[in-house]
Amino acid sequence: MITKLKSAVALYMIYRTLRDNPEKDIKYIYFSLELSSELLLAKLMCLYMYEEFGIVISYTELMSWEEILSDEKYEYIQKSRAWLSEISEKLLIFDKALTAKSFYRTVKGLLSEWGTFTKSADGRRELYQKDNPDQYVIVVVDHVGLCVPETGSSKKQEIDTISQYAVGLRERCQVSFFMLQQENRNSSNMDRRKMDMTECSSEDLKDTGNTYND
């Protein structure tokens, strides 16, 4: 249930941002390690139909091969597809296995399409210049605990490397990162909750707390 909730919160954040700011140059890079891109888009379409037309269609109904939709519902689906087409260049979903290397390669590759990497005068630093200074780039990893460790690397090491890459890109390229991560279900965490200490700390996170500190 918690897993579904955090994905739902992330998806609604994306929906709200794109829906409310159609004129802004916003790029979402979404690494969905739990849900397929088709399912995410279906959920976005359902949100749009409900808010725009007041029509309630579940994503299971939308994706079903057996469900026969009414002509009215089909018409609203077609209208909603037009909105999905509008945001297709703003929301880039990757739902395949993720390693630290593929994470860095994908994000930097897209940034190269939206700007230019150059070396500093002394050749010691890499600099980045956006093509559009007003562009917002937001990277979401849902969730980072499902990354795949490279050979010889532990899950913690892989997540820590992803976090290190994110910090470097954040500082160099002005990119925002949302690393969704599961909490530990240990006794100390439960004791803290009983004392109404509900704010998350690095010790509460599963696999590694470095994502919190970074």
Show where each model-derived region lies.
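The conserved Walker
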Residues: 1-2
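Helical hairpin unit composed of two closely spaced alpha helices linked by a short loop
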Residues: 122, 126-167
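Switch/connector loops and helix/strand junctions flanking conserved nucleotide-binding motifs
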Residues: 36-42, 53, 147-150, 186-190
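Short secondary-structure boundary/capping segments
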Residues: 44-50, 155, 192-198
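Cytosolic-facing regulatory segments adjacent to core modules
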Residues: 19-134
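Hydrophobic positions on the alpha1 helix immediately C-terminal to the Walker A/P-loop
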Residues: 5-9, 13, 40
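Generic enzyme active-site microenvironment
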Residues: 32, 140, 180
